[in-house]
Amino acid sequence: MTTQQETLTDGNALKQFVVLAKSSKGRAIVSIIEKALNHPSVFVFGELLDMPNVQQLKETEFKNYYDLLLIFAYGSFIDYKNKKDSLPQLTPQMITKLKQLTIVFLSSTSNVIPYSVLQEQIEITNVRELEDLIIDSIYQNIIKGKLDQKNKHLEIDFSIGRDVQPEQLDSMINCLNNWSSTSQKLLDDISGLITHSDKVHLQYRKEKEEFESKFEIAKLNTKNDSPAEQLYYDSMEYSDEVRMKKGPKIKGKDYNKRP
């Protein structure tokens, strides 16, 4: 028989917690929150946090578990430390996860994070322990980046997304609107360059066709010209053919000539 724990796989862990929260209340909700915070693959909690039965914890004796879930969704390790006395005690798994989420939080402000900042924010004094935590986070695909041990900083290339607080939505919308405006301007500039390039190409073709037409007319007219004039036009055509065969010369060098 499949147990509840076995069904909480990497792909559906959060979804399963959300489903369980729909029909649970009080202490049962607390148990679901604890399991979600301890689960090695769950790093976003907004959907669980928004569940009505979870929201109801704010009015009960279990409010501290709601506050704890709030920190894991939006906060950092320092936030927990500042409210530690009024919050449930963290398990070792929760401590590690919250420290990893703190690294993700810091990566949203800078893609180069000094060791000193990391050590202060997640309260790790030992550099080797800090690097082990970072390496574990990279292996878990929480972040992507590299350690610069010489300069003692972490270079971030990628980090997972975290939950967004409602009050952050307006700021995000403004950022997206600015990005959209910049992208549209860039697209308009590129379209303008393409249009200009097409015009130049068409003008070149037109001039080339006009020249070839005039040249053919001139050749036909040579039939009625004197022998000297006909020799002149023939020599012009011959010179063009020779130049085409020989190719370009730069600084007196013939690049079609074999060594």
UniProtKB/Swiss-Prot annotation:
Keyword Nucleus belongs to the record: yes
Location of this chain's protein in the cell: Cytoplasm; Nucleus
Signal sequence, start to end: none
Ranges of residues in domain PCI: 1-161
Matching SMART domains: PINT
GO cellular component terms attached to this protein's record: COP9 signalosome; cytoplasm
Origin superkingdom: Eukaryota
Keywords: Cytoplasm, Nucleus, Signalosome
InterPro entries in alphabetical order: COPS7/eIF3m (IPR045237), PCI_dom (IPR000717)
Primary location class: cytoplasm
Subunit organization: Component of the CSN complex. The holocomplex is comprised of 8 subunits csn1-8. In the complex, it probably interacts directly with csn2, csn5, csn6 and csn8.
Function: Component of the COP9 signalosome complex (CSN), a complex involved in various cellular and developmental processes. The CSN complex is an essential regulator of the ubiquitin (Ubl) conjugation pathway by mediating the deneddylation of the cullin subunits of E3 ligase complexes, leading to modify the Ubl ligase activity.
Family: Belongs to the CSN7/EIF3M family. CSN7 subfamily.
Name this protein carries in UniProt: COP9 signalosome complex subunit 7
Source species: Dictyostelium discoideum
